[in-house]
Amino acid sequence: CDLYPERVDSAQAILVRRGFPEAASYSGEEGWKQLCERDDIDLVYIVTPWLQHVPMAVYAMEQGKHVAVEVPAATSLEECWQLVNTAEKTQRHCMMLENCVYDFFELTTLNMARQGLFGDILHVEGSYIHDLDAFWDYYQDSWRLKFNQKHRGDVYATHGLGPACQVLDIHRGDKMNYLVSMDTKSVNGLKLAEEKLGATEFANADQTLTMIK
């Protein structure tokens, strides 16, 4: 399922070249709804621009499907509650797929921590330092650049935070109480927004640092 039919055709061609039959396919603005409405699937995997995650997840659960959604699953507290309430009402699972908690290094570290090799863990650090200049306007209608133009902070902090939370047993006996977040001014983001969008303001910083107790 993809917004653009030519991308669906490209995926179908890969299946055929490898000796597999073509899969059922959907495209266009509403194609994803048709997929969710099928009665022969159990789970919908959502890999779309961020602002589409919650509407698609909610609709899929309302159609009786479990949901696996890429990060960030939601972009506001209200959207988080919308996912929780819909999952509870429909009795469907809704899981955010934070790929970094499944990497070899992170899983190895978690295993070592649970075996007590580090003793009592008092402090952890996680980060996701990634130069995004080449990606800001790569996506359809520059949606990623536009999101960061209007929003400030770690928009998907779980790349670094997810593995750290597992090591600390967050929500498995411990919890976060408060945080302090600091950021730099925007230099690269503002420059790219000026070049690509003609914008004179850019909300998100080049670097954000958050301390959590």
Task: Describe these PLM feature segments.
Residues 1-18:
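N-terminal Rossmann-like dinucleotide-binding module
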Residues 90-95, 100-212:
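Predominantly a Rossmann-like dinucleotide-binding segment in NAD(P)-dependent oxidoreductases
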